[in-house]
Amino acid sequence: MDELRKLVWDGKINVQIAVNPQLLVKGINEKDVTVNLRIPRNAYLMNYIDEILNDLRKFLITDINFEELDGMFWFAYEGIPLYWNYPFGALYDSMVGIDPSIRYDQMKQCNSMMNIWKLQLNYSKEYPSGMIPIVDRVNQIQKYWMHQWKQACFVLNGTSKQVMSLSLVHSQQFWKSILMRDYITFYKIALKIIPSKPRHIPLMIHLTFPEIQIIQPICKFEDDSGNPQTLKDMLMTELPDIFSVDETPIAKVVSHGIEIPFDMPLFALYERFLSCDAFLHLSICMVTDDEMKRNKV
């Protein structure tokens, strides 16, 4: 389990950040202004905003006051705003799964074998609908992250005291383990919070069809017969229109870029694939026509 956890923790995504042309100094070609970087799946995109802005600052219009912002920087994928409060890998898995057959064809036609997620940096005084405003940069992200851990701790244990009782030193070490990509420290503290037999499992299901939405079901550790609940059990209960006993699945479940087998016990999946915010993020992605044909064989 430790080896798989480490692989999940080390996962990164190649990203290219372009800039909304309206933010560029007159005369600058938008195609000439990009930032390329690798962002960990197990991190928040906005943790990298300062690094991105440092590379772009000289190309941006002077109307933007970087010290006393009266607006907000945010990112979009093909015009769709990306909510910063979800781990980056979960955003990627769900957003590129909107129409995988088209994206698969696009990748086949690409000369490069490297998959790069192309995003756009935007700035506005009014926030996109549903997006949590950021007014305190990294400090606010840290507070939100700790809130998520308290919520997940309550789901797991029926109380948040395991998180609330962390010393200030351990709380700071916990947060810094994400910023510094310190796998050992992260799990050393996380495993003090996660019980061997939880009451429920912290879970977020990311759907992009028929509309973008997040579902947070109440998932028991065991079914009514005392058997560990599997991924399939949960899906048939929460998403019966997509996953049923008799029909070939029209979608697949992806976490950290890995397609998850339906028969995997849900808590075993959580132990191996939980994200930095203590939740198990599952992205529901439509299967391609070719995949549907293979599944029926």
From Swiss-Prot:
Residue location of crosslink Glycyl lysine isopeptide (Lys-Gly) (interchain with G-Cter in ATG12): 150
UniProt KW rRNA-binding keyword: no
Domain of life: Eukaryota
InterPro entries in alphabetical order: Atg5, ATG5_HBR, Atg5_HR, ATG5_UblA, Atg5_UblA_dom_sf, ATG5_UblB
Any Gene Ontology CC annotation: autophagosome
Post-translational modification: Conjugated to ATG12; which is essential for autophagy.
Cystine connections: none
Location(s), subcellular: Preautophagosomal structure membrane
Gene Ontology biological process terms in this record: cellular response to nitrogen starvation; cellular response to potassium ion starvation; cytoplasm to vacuole targeting by the Cvt pathway; mitophagy; piecemeal microautophagy of the nucleus
Keyword list, A-Z: Autophagy, Isopeptide bond, Membrane, Protein transport, Transport, Ubl conjugation
Sequence intervals crossing the membrane: none
GO molecular function annotation: Atg8-family ligase activity; cargo receptor ligand activity; enzyme activator activity
Transport among keywords: yes
Membrane topology: Peripheral membrane protein
Family listed: Belongs to the ATG5 family.
Role this protein plays: Involved in cytoplasm to vacuole transport (Cvt) and autophagic vesicle formation. Autophagy is essential for maintenance of amino acid levels and protein synthesis under nitrogen starvation. Required for selective autophagic degradation of the nucleus (nucleophagy). Also required for mitophagy, which eliminates defective or superfluous mitochondria in order to fulfill cellular energy requirements and prevent excess ROS production.
Subunit-structure text: Conjugated with ATG12.
Name the UniProt record assigns to this protein: Autophagy protein 5
Organism: Vanderwaltozyma polyspora (strain ATCC 22028 / DSM 70294 / BCRC 21397 / CBS 2163 / NBRC 10782 / NRRL Y-8283 / UCD 57-17)
Gene that this sequence comes from: ATG5
